[in-house]
């Protein structure tokens, strides 16, 4: 069994050397990697370029959130690096700037709707007048209007995203936990099969793989759960 390109493995590790070791351990079981804020300050871009040179796909989960001009300049640099996916916060000005910056590159812009660790109660505490589902729907529509390529949404909102956005929109779902693993801090988790059936185009699955005694075997088990869906 080989890698499924719909499975994205987050390299949420403390150093580039640890991340590099994990990639070597996983071998051909994973072909798509997410590089987040943990590695941003420790040569994460160098790792991204290295992995791209080895034929891997790269998702920069940096959740850009600043004034439009700053987001545009930053996204333009990242588009030139040849990465595949980049996250920005789902605010109209931010999304429009990132879309403008990517130009004719292959970079796909993903809007972050609502973090999967947040519950409806959390959103009320933060001052939002919407449930997670309603806020996700609102931001998906704004993302479509801004011209982004997809959204990051929890498995529970994947069907909503697919219904609103149609078949060609990317729906990347973190908070994916195989049936044999714990939910950890993902308040709105689902199995790989559940997320794909709901409409997800890509799944982000981390600790069930990286914290396993045999990460490669765990990755292949997840790929097996995705097979045929």
From Swiss-Prot:
One Pfam family, short name: OMPdecase
Cited function: Catalyzes the decarboxylation of orotidine 5'-monophosphate (OMP) to uridine 5'-monophosphate (UMP).
Self-association state and partner proteins as the record states: Homodimer.
Keywords on record: Decarboxylase, Lyase, Pyrimidine biosynthesis
Entry protein name: Orotidine 5'-phosphate decarboxylase
EC numbers on record: 4.1.1.23
Family: Belongs to the OMP decarboxylase family. Type 1 subfamily.
Originating organism: Caulobacter sp. (strain K31)
Highest rank taxon of the organism: Bacteria
Pathway listed: Pyrimidine metabolism; UMP biosynthesis via de novo pathway; UMP from orotate: step 2/2
Biological-process GO terms, alphabetical: 'de novo' pyrimidine nucleobase biosynthetic process; 'de novo' UMP biosynthetic process
Annotated residues for binding of substrate: 12, 34, 61-70, 116, 177, 186, 206-207
Gene: pyrF
An example Gene Ontology molecular-function term: orotidine-5'-phosphate decarboxylase activity
Catalytic function, reaction form: orotidine 5'-phosphate + H(+) = UMP + CO2
Active site annotation, chain numbering: 63
GO cellular component: cytosol
């Amino acid at each position: 069994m080989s890698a499924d390109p719909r499975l994205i493995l987050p390299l949420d590790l403390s150093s580039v050397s640890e991340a590099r070791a994990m990639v070597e351990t996983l071998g051909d079981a994973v072909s798509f990697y997410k590089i987040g804020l943990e590695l941003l300050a420790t040569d994460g871009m160098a790792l991204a370029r290295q992995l791209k040179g080895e034929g891997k796909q790269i998702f920069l989960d940096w959740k850009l959130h600043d004034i439009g001009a700053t987001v545009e300049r930053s996204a333009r640099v990242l588009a030139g690096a040849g990465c595949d996916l980049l996250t920005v916060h789902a605010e109209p000005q931010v999304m429009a700037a990132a879309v403008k910056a990517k130009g004719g590159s292959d970079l796909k812009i993903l809007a972050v709707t609502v973090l999967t660790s947040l519950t409806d109660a959390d959103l009320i505490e933060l001052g939002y007048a919407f449930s997670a589902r309603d806020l996700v729907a609102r931001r998906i529509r704004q993302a479509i209007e801004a011209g982004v390529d997809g959204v990051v949404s929890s498995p529970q909102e994947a069907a909503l995203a697919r219904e609103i956005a149609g078949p060609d929109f990317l729906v990347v779902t973190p908070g994916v936990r195989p049936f044999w693993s714990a939910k950890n801090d993902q308040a709105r988790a689902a199995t790989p099969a559940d997320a794909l059936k709901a409409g997800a185009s890509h799944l982000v699955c981390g600790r069930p793989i990286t914290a396993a005694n045999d990460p490669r075997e765990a990755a292949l088990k997840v790929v097996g759960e995705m097979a045929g869906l």
